[in-house]
Regions:
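General nucleic-acid-binding
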Residues: 1-6
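Short, Lys/Arg-enriched anionic-surface-contact patches
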Residues: 7-27
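Short amphipathic alpha helix immediately N-terminal
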Residues: 22-38
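Short alpha-helical "recognition helix" segments of helix-turn-helix
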Residues: 44-49
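Key DNA-contact positions within bacterial/archaeal DNA-binding proteins
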Residues: 54
Length: 73
């Protein structure tokens, strides 16, 4: 599930910081910010975090609905 995010970087950053919680949340927040705010590709993020592209995509797609829901409220 991929959404077009038409919100300010500040609002996206706040939603990610406030609603991405749990195990490995810090890493997941950084990955989401790299992609949705800084515009890095999944390949660039995977290299940066020493992960596979598949892992990065899974983190992004699994967590996207969580913070997107809070952008709409």
């Amino acid at each position: 599930m991929k959404h077009k995010i038409n919100d300010s970087a500040e609002n996206v950053r706040n939603a990610i910081d406030n609603y991405i919680i749990g195990f490995k949340a810090l890493r997941n927040r950084e990955i989401l910010k790299d992609h949705y705010i800084d515009g890095l590709t999944f390949e660039e993020i995977a290299e940066k975090h020493d992960m596979s592209v598949r892992q990065v995509k899974k983190i992004a797609y699994d967590n996207e609905p969580v913070f997107i829901e809070h952008l709409r409220t």
